Regions:
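NAD(P)-binding Rossmann-fold cofactor-contacting core
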Residues: 23-37
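C-terminal helical cap/extension that packs against the catalytic core
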Residues: 341-399
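Glycine-rich Rossmann-fold phosphate-binding loop(s) that bind the pyrophosphate
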Residues: 9
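Beta-strand->loop->alpha-helix junctions that form or flank phosphate-binding loops
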Residues: 74-79, 216-233, 279-283, 293-296, ...
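Short acidic low-complexity segments
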Residues: 33-47, 381
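Nucleotide phosphate-binding/pyrophosphate-handling subdomain across enzymes
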Residues: 3, 15-19, 23, 119, ...
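Phosphate-binding loop of NTP-binding sites
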Residues: 2-3, 14, 18-23, 40-46, ...
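Short internal beta-strands
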Residues: 29-31, 199-203, 328-329, 348-357
Length: 432
């Protein structure tokens, strides 16, 4: 029997296991918390056909030993894609990556396709693994597939019908040797495409433009500020010279969602989706949870949950959409430059509540740019911050409270979803 080893029992690992077992593989599961440990697994590396590493696991000593022995290291998406090719599945992949906006774009492209009459679902770094979808969802026309840089590190054959990189900004320096390495990894999403496929290109993004010439797919350009295949002019979205919709009529609000919408429109054009159907959808599409989500009003006080903002660029978009708000910010220290965040807060934020292990560093940067010390509240946790606000604000206070942390959650929470859920529960408990 053919043998494979899977390292990590998360969503992608368990999905790959189920898929490979239907193909007659003996699967050896390794997980330092839930199964055979990596130390024990060293004894089982003989006769392994290939090794699947879950995306969140770094290239530790065990993975390096696997590579040293010449065993092929793959990601779950590569295994699932190879299965699609072997089974001659007609499902087409629309692959989405980017530093920010990829989850919203992934989910909304899937929703748009279903609205237009196709059978589609989303998978990947959002919800289910591609392997699980292929096992349980038959006769799909499309899978809208969110891919993180971690999932794109070992691309060999993977190829999407349409691929896109929403934007690229500094992130994950704890994983990569440089930001250039991170950006180059993102571009693996398109490395196997040819002129029979499409790449949607954000021509506003400097890092994307630096690398776009290497793309062999048909390039469809989008821009918020200059003429492109799909672009914004005078607050209206156009395809070529054809007017599609006024930006004010979009149900997804904010400059970041305008960018996401351009990718949806470009996808619709590639697939010849009826423009009235497209417009209809864009006027009713709903935002995802934890993404600039206005979820509660305490009289005039509005509460917005943007827990998905795990990097500075993402928080920048939230601040631009909610100027003069009171910001709750901070969390795990990812080692990124906080000076741009401090400038953004100084120019646009009324007061800031700092939480998490990175609070001192953000405070230092804020003081460097001359942000008033009286506007900085360093209270360690979300709960302490909200309790302080409860003492200060009444239902007549005209305030917007924005949780947009600008970093990861792992110092106090399991995930950004957990952080957002706790924030919402605490707001309802304290103000509800």
């Amino acid at each position: 029997m053919k043998k494979v080893m899977i390292y990590g029992m998360g969503i992608s690992g368990t999905g790959a296991k189920a898929l490979l077992e239907t193909e007659g593989y003996e699967v050896i599961l390794v997980d330092d918390k839930k199964a055979m440990t990596s130390e024990e697994a060293m004894q089982h590396l003989d006769n392994i056909e290939f090794f699947i590493k879950s995306p969140g696991i770094p290239y530790n000593n065990f993975v390096k030993e696997v590579q040293k022995r010449g065993i092929k290291v793959l990601d779950e998406i590569e295994v699932a894609y190879n299965y699609m090719v072997e089974k001659n599945l007609k499902t087409k992949i629309i692959a989405i990556t980017g530093t920010n906006g990829k989850s919203t774009t992934t989910a909304k492209i899937s929703d748009l396709l279903n609205h237009a009459g196709y059978k589609a679902c989303y998978a990947g770094n959002i919800g289910r693994s591609l392997s699980e979808v292929l096992l349980h969802e038959k006769d799909l026309d499309f899978v809208s597939l969110e891919l993180s840089s971690f999932q794109l590190e070992n691309v060999e054959n993977f190829r999407a019908y349409i691929s896109m990189i929403i934007n690229m900004g500094p992130d994950h320096i704890e994983r990569y040797n440089s930001f250039d390495e991170y950006y180059d990894t993102k571009f693996n999403i398109a490395k196997n495409q040819d002129e029979n496929q499409y790449f949607i290109e954000n021509i506003d993004d400097v890092e994307i433009e630096k690398r776009a010439k290497q793309i062999k797919a048909k390039r469809i350009s989008v821009s918020k500020s200059k003429e492109a295949n799909v672009y914004v002019e005078d607050n209206k979205i156009y395809v070529g010279k054809d007017f599609i919709i006024e930006a004010d009529k979009l149900s997804l609000k904010g400059i970041h969602n305008l960018e996401n919408t351009l990718f949806m429109v470009a996808t619709a054009e590639i697939l010849n989706i009826d423009r009235e159907k497209l417009k209809e959808f864009l006027m009713v599409a709903t935002p995802l949870e934890h993404r600039t989500e206005l979820f509660f009003n305490y009289g005039k006080v509005k509460f917005i949950n943007d827990s998905k903002a795990t990097n500075v660029d993402s928080t920048k978009f939230a601040i631009q959409a909610n100027k003069d708000s009171i910001l709750i910010c901070g969390g795990y220290d990812k080692g990124v430059d906080l000076a741009p965040l401090a400038e953004m807060i100084k120019e646009n934020i009324k007061e800031v509540y700092l939480i998490g292990v990175i609070a001192d560093k953000i405070e230092t940067e804020l003081k460097k740019v001359g942000y008033e010390a009286s506007k900085i509240h360093k209270l360690e946790t979300v709960e302490n911050s909200l309790l302080d606000m409860k003492k200060r604000f009444t239902k007549d206070s005209d305030e917007v409270i924005l949780l947009s942390p600008a970093t990861s959650s792992y110092d106090q929470f399991n995930s950004f979803e957990h952080r957002g859920k706790v924030f919402k529960e605490l707001v309802l408990k304290i103000f509800g």
